[in-house]
Amino acid sequence: FRPGSGIEPPQLLREVRPIYTDDARRRAIEGDVVMEIVVRRDGTVGDVRVLRTLGSGLEQRAIAAVRQWKFAPARRLGSAVDVVVEVAVGFTLR
C-alpha cells in the first residue's frame, strides 16, 4: 500500500542519523539521499530503493541508518499494513 485513500501513514518513532564518509566530508558534500522504503506492519524497515544519491558512499550510509529506524506502522481499517513511503536523509556538515 501507499499512504492515502484510507491508509493512515506510518509515524517515525526512532530516527538514526547517518555518518559521513571521509571522502564526502573532505569534498564538503551536503544534500539529501532520497529513498523509497517499505515500512513493515511491525514498524521495521524492509526493502530500500535509492531514488537520488549524492555519491561518495553516502547512499550506503543513508541505507544503514534508515534500516535502524522504527515506526508506528501504517494502518488500513484499523489493522497494521506494509506501506511504501519516500524519505529523504539529509547530510549537513557542522
Predicted regions mapped to residue ranges:
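Short, functionally important structural connectors and interaction interfaces within domains
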Residues: 4-8, 12, 16, 37, ...
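A short, well-structured alpha-helical segment
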Residues: 20-23, 28-32, 40-75
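Acidic, low-complexity proline/glycine/alanine-rich linker and hinge segments
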Residues: 1-27, 64-66, 87
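Alpha-helical interaction segments
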Residues: 10, 58-62, 81
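A beta-hairpin/wing motif
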Residues: 9, 16-17, 27-41, 77-94
